[in-house]
């Protein structure tokens, strides 16, 4: 009984580790190339470089042209606030 429990827990541990390794290899995580790309893009955003990719330039343009947010203005909620039905307690 004790040996079965040890073998089962060992099998469970190995299968969980195998699933993690498999998922990690599918996602392509941990590659040196992806690390260098993220390092480059983070450096671009922190130094406000003008060398933007076309997709980044479009996003930046949209952000720049967006109207300023007015957080002090009262806006009605998009849903009714008062219930028009009665909630009966469960008996």
From Swiss-Prot:
Predominantly, its location class is membrane
The residue range of the signal peptide is 1-18
Membrane topology category: Lipid-anchor
State whether keyword Signal applies.
Answer: yes
Query: Which keywords does this chain's UniProt record carry?
Result: Cell membrane, Lipoprotein, Membrane, Palmitate, Signal
Q: Where is the lipid attached (N-palmitoyl cysteine)?
A: 19
Please give the sites of covalent lipid attachment annotated as S-diacylglycerol cysteine: 19
Q: Name one GO biological process term.
A: colanic acid biosynthetic process
Q: Name one GO cellular component term.
A: plasma membrane
What compartments host this protein?
Cell membrane
Q: What is this protein called?
A: Uncharacterized lipoprotein YpdI
The opening ranks of the lineage are: Bacteria, Pseudomonadati, Pseudomonadota, Gammaproteobacteria, Enterobacterales
């Amino acid at each position: 009984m004790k040996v079965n429990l040890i073998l089962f827990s060992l099998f469970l541990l190995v299968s969980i580790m195998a699933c993690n390794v498999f998922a990690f290899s599918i996602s392509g995580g941990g590659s040196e190339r992806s690390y260098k790309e993220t390092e480059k893009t983070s450096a671009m955003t922190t130094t406000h470089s003008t060398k933007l990719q076309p997709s980044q330039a479009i996003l930046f343009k949209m952000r720049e042209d967006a109207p300023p947010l007015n957080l002090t203005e009262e806006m009605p909620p998009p849903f009714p606030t008062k219930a028009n039905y009665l909630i009966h307690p469960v008996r």
